[in-house]
């Protein structure tokens, strides 16, 4: 998967299209990411010792990696490729050519 935790990304599809934020969690087994402040859903919680009445909690839900593009340091969004630099495999922005790692 080309997106990692801590990457700055732009959402390119869905209800939060155009939002730029940071990846909180990457879920490579299901090809999804959780992005800060994106795809907020309301989760109904049962009553427990902390919340005797129960609660409705807003939290971030995962979105598919195909709906985000990684931004480089200059804020250019593009596809991610891999190349070898000094014997190390690094990610780079295919549009700007800038190394991401």
Swiss-Prot record:
Keywords: Ribonucleoprotein, Ribosomal protein, RNA-binding, rRNA-binding
SMART domains attached to this UniProt entry: KOW
The UniProt record lists the keyword Ribosomal protein: yes
Gene Ontology MF terms in the entry: rRNA binding; structural constituent of ribosome
One BP term from GO: translation
PROSITE patterns: RIBOSOMAL_L24
Listed GO CC annotations: ribonucleoprotein complex; ribosome
One Pfam family of this chain: KOW
SUPFAM superfamilies in UniProt: Translation proteins SH3-like domain (SSF50104)
Keyword Electron transport found: no
Family under the similarity heading: Belongs to the universal ribosomal protein uL24 family.
Function: One of two assembly initiator proteins, it binds directly to the 5'-end of the 23S rRNA, where it nucleates assembly of the 50S subunit.
Subunit structure: Part of the 50S ribosomal subunit.
Protein name per its UniProtKB record: Large ribosomal subunit protein uL24
Species, as recorded: Streptococcus suis (strain 05ZYH33)
Lineage: Bacteria, Bacillati, Bacillota, Bacilli, Lactobacillales
């Amino acid at each position: 998967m080309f997106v990692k935790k801590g990457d700055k990304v732009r959402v390119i599809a869905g209800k939060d299209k155009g939002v730029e934020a940071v990846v909180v969690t990457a879920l490579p087994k299901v090809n999804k990411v959780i992005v800060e402040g994106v795809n907020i859903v309301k989760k109904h919680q049962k009553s427990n010792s902390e919340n005797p009445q129960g609660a409705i909690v807003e939290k971030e839900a995962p979105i598919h990696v195909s709906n985000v593009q990684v931004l480089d340091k200059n804020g250019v969004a593009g596809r991610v490729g891999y190349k070898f630099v000094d014997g190390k495999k690094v990610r780079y922005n295919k549009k700007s050519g800038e190394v991401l790692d």
